[in-house]
């Protein structure tokens, strides 16, 4: 980098170099000499222009002598005119004769009488001047504004008479202190002054090298953390100055540069008024005050007046740079604050965003859009009026070329008169010339597409109906903009890359986006429906032509079921489907079209054709599909009448029943049997139930009406318009409505829209409707801001190389939450490259080898083989120095091919996440206690077959003989099937190496068999404990090293299901299965073929023919294998003991046939518990004693109506002095103490004797308040901003055993002692509930308290891979629930950008300081440099930075400054002399050159031209 800089020479600002000649951009602080070198003269007068002659005043702010002539090549007095005098300086008015363009870059200066501080370096935090001098910002401001004195040389001065408290250099004294001290010590060399001069002197005197060395020593010596922080801050500023070659005193201005006049113009308005740029007013105030100060100094005015004038000068310069930063803003004539230089560049209206990143362009126009159903996919209709304007220069050239016009003037005239030749030429110009159409808001790359224009009459642009969904356009008055690409390159790009017929797939997910919608779907749906008893039924037709003839002769109904010949066999279809078949390519299998086509089916059909036929075939097919859809929708003429909206007859009665049920609940509540919360929940449940059952009846009714030809049903069923929820409101009942705070009103709207609402119901409805509209407006803004942040953080990720050569990757598996599948494995691995081989879990052979790109077939194959997790190459583990490599990215979703070098994948990723943002909800869901009985889990049930294994599980057997779970965590129940059995009796040996586990059974003297297992295939302890990862499909070792086994015992097992404690089975649940018990289920064949039975011997299967249909299985390790015709294994099924076999050996079976089944068909329950309360159970036998359980104070007596007993219940609020508890004195004399929570109900009496596992008390779960769940957009931005949640949960940093130390200031001290002697301490707040107890074993990443887990903690405890997994699955959860498909890779790219910074822990021999936060790239470059010199490299830890901070902290100055915090970014960059290498997109857009992606990445010297031989 420094090498690179040595070869660069600075360019003058006004040089004629082109943007492509700029190699890099560096910001520095300007020295006074530099300012003078820029200047063309001093501005002495505040005047602007003469009011009579309107000529600029000499030496004023618009002076022509300084800044250059006003008219091109003409001096001010008019003595010299025309080009021939170029460069002459007029002796009369002093103006150089040259182009007036120089007024845009010639600068002037103002010679300030007193040095003035630059406000950016004073008030922009951290204050740079203050930091250097070690003075507080407030004190520094007091000195600069002449309110306090700063000491330069203290002499012998001290604050007291004894000299014990001496005055130090840089002390700030107020007026009183100064008067006192100077009267006593004034003649002993005390020098203390106020104002800019003294600050400038102090800065000039600093010896930075010396200070740097001194501070480096101090930082080693100091122990206090706070002191270290301040020293590091100072070190950073000093280091920045040393590196950049800036001098500290340059932060004080003595020469103020004056902006070129054309950049702060004076514009004359009609009516003789002038609109003047605010900057001019601010400059005028500076000049006025400076001139006045000059006079006062010359007159030797009293100190106090001069001082006041200097202060005012400082304020005037402050206002010029950043008005309103300090004190009140300076206001103009119209009472609004003037816009200072800072405001001119920052914000949406500032230079960066308004003029540099977004410019208005010529050759563009906009108009309303209308639908153009007769257009081809790559066409749009362009009004002739617009075309004639847009293509005017092209048109004029064409008219001349064809000889219709001799001069341009004549051509122009012809165009104005619109003679016939003009139209003829226009047709020729427009032919084959693409135009770009854009619809705002431009949310993703499909919002700008290219079309070939077709000239049309009228004034509206015609748009092809299939591209509407990409533009998100409709025809209710939307407008679109047209742009004409001018250069050959732009035209080529538009034709090759941007034509609408090329952009059929959505870059976010790779699914087709240009698919028919609405009317077209309705037409195609109707076309493929079947009707009974119509003309031409069951007739046989040879081909489509015959069908069409019959149809036109009205001998055949469109929906008649007919027979036809397909692939040489007779198949049934309908007339309509055969007509559709005529436009479908021949290679499409029957299953795609010979059925009723709904929206999803049409999407699948298009996807299939794209996959096989490619882009051009698909585009043609889509056009045909569109035409056919519209044609039949028109022919059919589906319409809705009131009679189509059927109301089910049972509605009345059902509503009545619900009302009765509600009355009953109210009665119970009045009798005191229910709490208010329970009553509310039950009522809501009753109405929800009623609504659902009415809706079900209604949908059934509509489906059967008219044999499925009911218009309402057709529209909703096909996916053309409307949904079940809307039909329910039309003719079912409107249902429950929400209040403004999100809670549900318990009286529902029982009417529907067909019956009409009464006034009250209508009133309740208006609220929801209005909230919907308000939400939408807010949502759009939020989603837009999120997109902008994402673009900014990801814009510099581009594909920079083909393969970075890494073997690392990220392990992915299904994303499942509870029982809901969020994203299946096949979706996650599609389009990615493998980092490790995929091994078939059954046959252990390599299914897919490393480095393979996974297509759809492979993905499905992998999922069907039962693979649970796959290691993929990922952006996060890519080792490319800049950007990312193609292999780690995978498929380019937009064209289904491997991504090419130069693809701007970062921007695509940001668009893919941001664009659907507007479809997400804005709500934070208040679950507000709607925890209904139906929702709570009360048991877990096995869904697969196998046998039970307890993992780490200890149980109590209570007095009734039931098994009770005794572990609180780090245990579980597994359902497994055998994988390897011991072939002999003996001792097990397990040896763990780096990546393998070798297991063997000792065999006296004989050769023992060893089994090698991949370490990654075996479930780790934290996975078994339910903390991390998925365990299904992993291997489980039931034995430990040194255990004895019998022959035939299983030593390696495959986990089929797992229920960890406490996340799936709570503490103190009742277990329904013993360890080792078989679990039988109905086993269905996964494939078609022949069944063969085998027994497991060691790790291979041995044929077994002692089984026939009807047998009950007694053998262990019996497998049924289904083989296909080639005798290859197609499916393997474990048959557990106790099953009844349903097929004979060697029997032929179809897919889905039953192979075996349990004797009795009942669910196998693994464990059960009470879902509403958490029990406290006795861990041993003993005697109880109550503590602080005092009736009337901490507990109340409750009379139980059912049993007639009284029980004690703790109060909700317990006085602070009391800590209610039960202690259990065991027989061994040990005391166990159980702390009791509020609302707990006691089941025992004081002094009672209890047995093991007896229930002592129960705490109701309802008392644990349900938290608001953040969902939708706020959740996404919370994840990407890496905010620390308010209600944060503590998580374990290491694996170890929990204990509690002595509390600190009312906080509990939780200690984890690790296996290798590490110890971590954490403090738990009073209002948090600890989820762990003394002596329990926890794994890193496990929650220790309730609350929300922070992503920063996941990174610290579990590392980067776990964090990736967390962010990706959390973001996917939000989008998938809204039905939005986004490929993981997009989310991963943004996440890897959030991880691009590291925090230095040890600096080694590098230039870093511990605690520095720097980009990974800088860190690696510096370490390589240090290692090359033989030094000690620095050590850093990964950091997670929110996207806003990551964007502001970008390596590029321009990109960071144009995003947010402009002044802050520019301030720190100028001091550090940061160099912007112009490597990314934004910077290059700003300086106006090609962006370095795609062909822009290839430097011009890489392309060599050579003469043809």
Curated annotation (Swiss-Prot):
Entry keyword annotation includes Cell division = no
| Keyword line | DNA-directed RNA polymerase, Magnesium, Metal-binding, Nucleotidyltransferase, Transcription, Transferase, Zinc
Which InterPro entries does the annotation name? DNA-dir_RpoC_beta_prime, DNA-dir_RpoC_beta_prime_bact, RNA_pol_asu, RNA_pol_N, RNA_pol_Rpb1_1, RNA_pol_Rpb1_3, RNA_pol_Rpb1_3_sf, RNA_pol_Rpb1_4
Q: Which residues bind Zn(2+) 1?
A: 75, 77, 90, 93
Give me the comment on cofactor binding: Binds 1 Mg(2+) ion per subunit.
GO terms, biological process: DNA-templated transcription
**Which family would the database say this protein is a member of?**
Belongs to the RNA polymerase beta' chain family.
What does the record give as the function of this protein? DNA-dependent RNA polymerase catalyzes the transcription of DNA into RNA using the four ribonucleoside triphosphates as substrates.
The name of this protein is: DNA-directed RNA polymerase subunit beta'
């Amino acid at each position: 980098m420094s090498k690179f800089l040595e070869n660069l020479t600075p360019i003058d600002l006004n040089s004629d170099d082109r943007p492509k000649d700029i190699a890099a951009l560096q910001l520095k602080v300007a020295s006074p000499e530099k300012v003078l070198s820029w200047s063309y003269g001093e501005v002495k007068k505040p005047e602007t222009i003469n009011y009579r002659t309107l000529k600029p005043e000499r030496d004023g702010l618009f002076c022509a002598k300084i800044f250059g002539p006003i008219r091109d090549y003409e001096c001010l007095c008019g003595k010299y005119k025309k080009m021939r005098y170029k460069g002459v300086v007029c002796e009369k008015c002093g103006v150089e004769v040259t182009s007036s363009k120089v007024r845009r870059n010639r600068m002037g200066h103002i010679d300030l009488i007193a040095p003035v501080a630059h406000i950016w370096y004073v008030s922009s935090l951290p204050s740079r001047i203050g930091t250097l001098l070690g003075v507080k910002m407030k004190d520094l401001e007091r000195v600069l504004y002449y309110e306090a004195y700063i000491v330069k040389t203290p002499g012998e001065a001290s604050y007291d008479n004894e000299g014990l408290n001496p005055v130090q250099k840089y002390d700030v004294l107020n007026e009183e202190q100064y008067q006192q001290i100077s009267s006593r010590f004034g003649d002993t060399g005390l020098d203390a002054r106020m104002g800019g001069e003294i600050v400038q002197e102090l800065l000039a005197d600093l010896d930075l090298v010396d200070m740097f060395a001194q501070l480096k020593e101090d930082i080693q010596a100091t122990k206090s953390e706070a002191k270290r922080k301040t020293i590091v801050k100072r070190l950073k500023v000093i280091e920045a100055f040393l590196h950049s070659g800036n001098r500290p005193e340059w932060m004080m201005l003595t020469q103020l540069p004056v902006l070129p006049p054309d950049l702060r113009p004076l514009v004359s308005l009609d009516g003789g008024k002038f609109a003047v740029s605010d900057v001019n007013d601010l400059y005028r105030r500076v000049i006025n005050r400076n001139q006045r100060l000059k006079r006062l100094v010359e007159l030797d005015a009293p100190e106090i007046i001069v001082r006041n004038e200097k202060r005012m000068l400082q304020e005037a310069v402050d206002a010029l740079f950043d008005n309103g930063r300090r004190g009140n803003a300076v206001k103009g004539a119209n009472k609004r604050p003037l816009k200072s230089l800072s405001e001119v560049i920052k914000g949406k209206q500032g230079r960066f965003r308004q003029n540099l990143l977004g410019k208005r362009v010529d050759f563009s126009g906009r108009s309303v859009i209308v639908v153009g159903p007769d257009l081809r996919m790559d066409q749009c209709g362009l009004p002739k009026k617009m075309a004639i304007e847009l293509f005017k220069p092209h048109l004029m050239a064409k008219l001349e070329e064809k000889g219709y016009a001799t001069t341009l003037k004549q051509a122009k005239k012809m165009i104005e008169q619109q003679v016939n030749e003009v139209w003829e030429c226009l047709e020729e110009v427009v032919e084959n010339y693409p135009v770009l159409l854009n619809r705002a808001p431009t949310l993703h790359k499909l919002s700008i597409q290219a079309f070939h224009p077709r000239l049309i009459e009228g004034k509206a642009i015609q748009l092809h109906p299939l591209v509407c969904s990409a533009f998100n356009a409709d025809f209710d008055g939307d407008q679109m903009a047209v742009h004409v690409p001018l250069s050959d390159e732009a035209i080529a790009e538009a034709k090759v890359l941007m034509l609408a017929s090329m952009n059929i797939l959505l870059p976010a997910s790779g699914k087709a986006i240009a698919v028919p919608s609405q009317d077209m779907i309705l037409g195609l749906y109707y076309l493929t429906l079947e009707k009974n008893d119509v003309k031409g039924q069951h007739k046989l037709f040879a081909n489509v032509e015959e069908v069409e003839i019959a149809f036109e002769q009205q001998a055949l109904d469109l929906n008649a079921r007919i027979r036809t010949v397909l692939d040489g066999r007779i198949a049934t279809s309908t007339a309509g489907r055969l007509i559709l078949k005529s436009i479908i390519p021949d290679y499409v299998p029957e299953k795609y079209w010979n059925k009723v086509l709904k929206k999803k089916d049409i999407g699948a059909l298009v996807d299939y054709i794209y996959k096989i036929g490619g882009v051009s075939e698909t585009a043609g097919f889509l056009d045909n599909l569109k035409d056919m859809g519209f044609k039949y929708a028109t022919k059919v003429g589906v319409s809705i009448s009131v009679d189509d909206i059927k109301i089910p007859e049972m509605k009345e009665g059902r509503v009545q029943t619900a009302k009765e049920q509600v009355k009953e609940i109210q009665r119970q509540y009045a009798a005191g049997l229910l709490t208010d919360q329970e009553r509310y929940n039950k009522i809501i449940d009753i109405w929800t139930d009623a609504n659902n059952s009415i809706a079900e009846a209604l949908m059934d009714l509509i489906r059967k009406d008219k044999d499925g030809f009911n218009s309402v049903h057709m529209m909703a069923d096909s996916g053309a318009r409307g949904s079940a929820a809307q039909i329910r409101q039309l003719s079912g009942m409107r249902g429950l409505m929400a209040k403004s705070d999100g809670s549900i009103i318990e009286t529902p709207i029982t009417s529907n829209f067909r019956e009409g609402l009464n006034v009250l119901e209508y009133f309740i409805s208006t609220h929801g409707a209005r909230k919907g509209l308000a939400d939408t407006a807010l949502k759009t803004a939020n989603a837009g801001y999120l997109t902008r942040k994402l673009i900014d953080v990801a814009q510099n990720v581009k594909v920079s190389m083909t393969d970075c050569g890494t073997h690392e990757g990220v392990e992915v598996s299904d994303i499942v939450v509870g029982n809901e599948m969020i994203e299946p494995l096949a979706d996650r691995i599609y389009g990615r490259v493998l980092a490790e081989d995929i091994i078939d879990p059954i046959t252990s052979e390599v299914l897919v080898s490393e480095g393979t790109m996974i297509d759809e077939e492979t993905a499905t194959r992998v999922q069907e083989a039962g693979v649970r997790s796959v290691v993929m190459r990922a952006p996060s583990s890519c080792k490319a120095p800049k950007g990312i490599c193609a292999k780690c990215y995978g498929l380019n979703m937009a064209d289904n091919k491997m991504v090419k070098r130069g693809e701007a994948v970062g921007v695509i990723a940001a668009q893919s996440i941001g664009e659907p943002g507007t479809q997400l909800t804005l709500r934070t869901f208040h679950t507000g206690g709607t925890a209904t009985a139906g929702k709570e889990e009360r048991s877990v049930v096995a869904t697969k077959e196998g046998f039970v294994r307890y993992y780490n599980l200890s149980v109590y057997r209570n007095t009734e003989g039931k098994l009770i779970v005794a572990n609180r965590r780090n245990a579980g129940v597994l359902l497994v099937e055998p994988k390897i059995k011991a072939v002999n009796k003996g001792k097990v040996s397990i040896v763990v190496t780096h990546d393998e586990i070798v297991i063997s059974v000792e065999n006296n003297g004989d050769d023992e068999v060893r089994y090698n297992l991949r370490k990654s295939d075996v479930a780790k302890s934290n996975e078994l404990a339910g903390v991390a990862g998925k365990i299904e499909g992993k291997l489980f070792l039931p034995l430990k090293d040194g255990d004895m086994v019998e022959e035939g015992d299983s030593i390696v097992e495959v986990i089929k299901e797992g229920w960890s404690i406490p996340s799936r089975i709570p503490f103190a649940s009742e277990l329904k299965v013993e360890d080792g018990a078989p679990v039988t289920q109905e086993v269905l064949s996964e494939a078609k073929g022949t069944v063969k039975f085998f027994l497991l011997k060691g790790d291979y299967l041995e044929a077994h023919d002692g089984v026939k249909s009807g047998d009950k299985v007694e053998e262990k390790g019996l497998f049924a294998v289904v083989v296909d015709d080639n005798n290859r294994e197609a499916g393997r099924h474990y048959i557990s003991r106790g099953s009844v076999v349903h097929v004979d050996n060697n029997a032929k079976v179809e897919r889905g046939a039953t192979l075996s089944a349990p004797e009795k068909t009942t669910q196998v329950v693994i464990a059960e518990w009470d879902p509403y309360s958490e029990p406290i159970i006795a861990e041993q036998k003993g005697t109880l004693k109550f503590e602080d359980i005092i009736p009337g104070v901490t507990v109340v007596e409750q009379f139980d109506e059912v049993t007639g007993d009284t029980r004690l219940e703790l109060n909700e609020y317990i006085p602070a002095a009391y800590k209610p508890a039960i202690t259990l004195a065991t027989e061994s004399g040990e005391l166990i103490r159980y702390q009791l929570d509020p609302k707990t109900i006691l089941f025992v009496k004081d002094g009672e004797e209890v047995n093991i596992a007896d229930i002592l008390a129960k705490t109701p779960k309802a008392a644990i308040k349900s938290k608001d769940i953040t969902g939708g957009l706020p959740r996404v931005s919370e994840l990407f901003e890496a905010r620390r949640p308010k209600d944060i949960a503590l998580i374990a940093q290491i694996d170890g055993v929990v204990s509690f130390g002595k509390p600190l200031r009312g906080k509990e001290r939780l200690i984890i002692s690790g296996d290798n002697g590490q110890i971590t301490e954490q403090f738990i707040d009073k209002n948090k509930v600890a989820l762990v107890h003394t002596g329990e074993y926890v794994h890193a990443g496990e929650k220790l308290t309730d609350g929300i887990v922070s992503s920063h903690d996941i990174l610290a405890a579990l590392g980067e891979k776990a964090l990736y997994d967390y962010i990706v699955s959390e973001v996917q959860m939000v989008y998938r629930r809204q039905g939005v498909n986004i490929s993981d890779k997009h989310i991963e790219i943004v996440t890897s950008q959030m991880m691009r910074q590291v925090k230095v822990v040890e600096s080694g021999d590098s230039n870093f300081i511990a605690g520095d936060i720097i980009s990974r790239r800088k860190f690696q470059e510096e370490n390589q440099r240090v290692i090359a010199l033989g030094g000690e490299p620095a050590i850093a830890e990964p950091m997670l930075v929110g996207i806003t901070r990551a964007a502001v902290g970008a390596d590029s100055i321009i990109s960071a400054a144009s995003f947010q915090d402009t002044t802050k970014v520019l301030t720190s960059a100028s001091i550090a002399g940061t160099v912007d290498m112009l490597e990314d997109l934004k910077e290059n857009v700003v300086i106006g050159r090609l962006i370095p992606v795609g062909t822009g990445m290839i430097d011009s010297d890489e392309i060599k031209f050579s003469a043809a031989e």
